[in-house]
Amino acid sequence: MAAAQARAVVEAVTRAHPGRVIISTSGQIVDQPGSPLQAPADSPIMTLIDGVTDSGVPTAVVAPRLYLENLLLPVVLGPVREEGVLRYPLPASFPVSWSSHLDVAEVVARLLTDASPTTGTVGVGHLPGLTGPDLAAAFSNHLGREVRFEGITPEAFGELITPLFGPAAAPVVELYRALNAQDGNTIAEDGSAQELLGLRPRSIGQWLEDLAVS
């Protein structure tokens, strides 16, 4: 989303004044002030969140971290199937509050339909965070054969995805460079969908089953 688009949405919400608004960050981090991962105050996503919140419309911000669907990229899933290796640009011990688009959809649906609007940020994802070996074990159980995790560098991942994404691969590489400089990428328990809405993300095994990954 560009800054102009964010401002246009803010203007539309201010004029229409709907009963409630739900914003998804799509993985951008907006709830860790002071962290190097926090979206800048003048970024489009923060412009959108601040503007809509200031409009007076009850606003909830759905804040996932990394999407499980990233693991379905051909350059990731292919080696899982062919070599029994799950390669991803994070250290093996790096915990992540992974979630799927299905999990996010369930949270958004609840926020839109609850009798009383929930406001503020709602983190979506696994707690405690899952590591690379946790993901590999889930793939092993689902596929019925051994899968091991192998951390690769952001640069190596960039070489894999550039044929798919072209220039759009560059910011992905930068994201994983930034993540590699941290100890993890997890949501806060007190602001999680588990705590606020009683909604837990599906297990990795259930997600693989739901999407019929083979």
Residue ranges and their predicted role:
Residues 11-20, 27-148, 159-160, 164:
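Oxidoreductase cofactor-interface core, primarily capturing Rossmann-like NAD(P)-dependent enzymes
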Residues 154-214:
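A hydrophobic C-terminal alpha-helical subdomain
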